[in-house]
Swiss-Prot record:
Membership in a protein family: Belongs to the succinate/malate CoA ligase beta subunit family.
HAMAP family with a match to the protein in the record: Succ_CoA_beta (MF_00558)
Signal peptide: none
Organism encoding this protein: Histophilus somni (strain 2336)
Domain ATP-grasp positions: 9-244
GO molecular function: ATP binding; magnesium ion binding; succinate-CoA ligase (ADP-forming) activity; succinate-CoA ligase (GDP-forming) activity
Positions that bind ATP: 46, 53-55, 99, 102, 107
Gene this chain is encoded by: sucC
Name of one Pfam family that matches: Ligase_CoA
Enzyme Commission number, as recorded: 6.2.1.5
GO biological process: succinyl-CoA metabolic process; tricarboxylic acid cycle
Protein name per its UniProtKB record: Succinate--CoA ligase [ADP-forming] subunit beta
Length: 389
């Protein structure tokens, strides 16, 4: 689960990290009131969305007067911001964060992630802050420094000092960086995070370190332990289909193709998408109904797939191991009868009660294409999608 910048900075402040006092505003009146409370004569206005690249898209701007604040809010509030990290529709802007401008001497980069290979938390730091870290890793990998945290002892101050030396820090900056490093590690573990990023972590003109930006991603599987974080969830930033799928324990990810997919098992779902691509098609989604698929969940899965107007055909690929193919078939028939599916549906059933499932489909008198092989299913789906366009 992603947090907004202002929410992330609130977490940082709770852990004693250096962040400025800012105000999140939902209308112009709140914004004008906020700048009266903020120090300085210039402020930063930041559109709050769950995506990076806001600055390049115009969603972050220095404002120098009440009129500029009013203009910025009028332009962006209630609109959608398209960045390199969003789709073509962009993300809705319901809040804008205002904070004082900082006098920056240098920009650094600091982040923490879970390294899947070592199964440990890894901190990454670079002296090239304020830019895309992927670009730094590709063009100047020697400027990206890594530290792995031993889960038995946790983050140690000496590791923070080592990173500080590599970043070219000196004097009191080294001690301050080490403190920031240790507190971030504590935050990462205690709040069950999967990503934490400060880009940039800046050195101010007074030589103090400061968290100018903040990005936090919480592990969805641990949200039940953190009701305080769960209450920060902003559903307006999420795909409504994915949110609906979550209610039914369906694993759904929207894509940009035109062939809807409903599969049981993540591996089989990925394989199904691959074979669709192999035959020249484009999957519209990843959807895993899971091993405990029921008739009701299959119906809901169909409804979610068909809310995507781009879908021109649906491919159902079920391997009946835990789940019974006849139950899936009944769910498919019920879904089509209830919601009136107008696009071709190609069904491949294999495994437990597959013959019975195919018989149920055949007796339904619906416009279903039942096939035996995955290759044939993919070919039929690709052809059907092309004919429907």
């Amino acid at each position: 689960m992603n947090l907004h910048e202002y929410q992330s900075k609130k977490l940082f402040a709770d852990y004693g990290l250096p962040v400025t006092k800012g105000y999140v505003c939902e209308n112009v009146e709140q914004a004008l009131s906020a700048i009266e409370k903020l120090s300085g004569s210039q402020w930063i206005a930041k559109c709050q969305i769950h995506a990076g690249g806001r600055g390049k898209a115009g969603g972050v701007k220095v404002v120098k007067s009440a009129q500029e604040v009013r203009s910025f809010f009028t332009k962006f509030l209630g609109q959608r911001l398209v960045t390199v990290q969003t789709n073509e529709q962009g993300q809705p802007i319901h809040q804008i964060y205002l904070e004082p401008c900082a006098e920056i001497q240098k920009e650094l980069y600091l982040s923490a992630i879970i390294d899947r290979s070592s199964q440990r938390i890894v901190f990454m730091a670079s002296s090239e802050g304020g830019m895309d870290i992927e670009e730094v890793a590709e063009k100047t990998p020697h400027l990206l420094h890594r530290v792995t945290i031993d889960p038995l002892v946790g983050a140690m101050p000496y590791q923070g000092r080592e990173l500080a030396f590599k970043l070219g820090l000196s004097g009191k900056q080294i001690q301050q960086f080490s403190q920031i490093f240790c507190q971030l590690a504590k935050l990462f573990v205690e709040k069950d995070l999967s990503l934490l990023e400060i880009n940039p972590l800046v050195i101010l003109k007074n030589d103090e370190l400061f968290c100018l930006d903040a990005k936090v991603v919480v592990d969805d599987n641990a949200l039940y332990r953190h009701p305080d974080l769960f209450s920060m969830r902003d559903l307006t930033q999420e795909d409504p289909r994915e949110a609906e799928a979550e209610k039914w324990n369906l694993n759904y990810v929207a894509l940009d193709g035109n062939i809807g997919c409903m599969v049981n098992g993540a591996g089989l779902a990925m394989g199904t998408m691959d074979i669709i691509k192999l035959h020249g098609g484009r999957p519209a989604n990843f959807l895993d109904v899971g091993g405990g698929a029921t008739k009701e969940r299959v119906m809901e899965a169909f409804k979610i797939i068909l809310t995507d107007s781009a879908v021109k055909a649906v491919l159902v690929n079920i391997f009946g191991g835990i789940v019974r193919c006849d139950l899936i078939a009944k769910g498919i028939v019920s879904a089509i009868n209830e919601i009136g599916v107008s696009v071709p549906v190609i069904v491949r059933l294999e495994g437990t009660n597959a013959d019975l499932g195919r018989e149920i489909l055949a007796q339904s008198n619906l416009n279903l294409i039942a096939v035996n092989s995955l290759t044939e299913a993919a070919e039929q789906a690709v052809n059907a999608a092309k004919e429907s366009e």
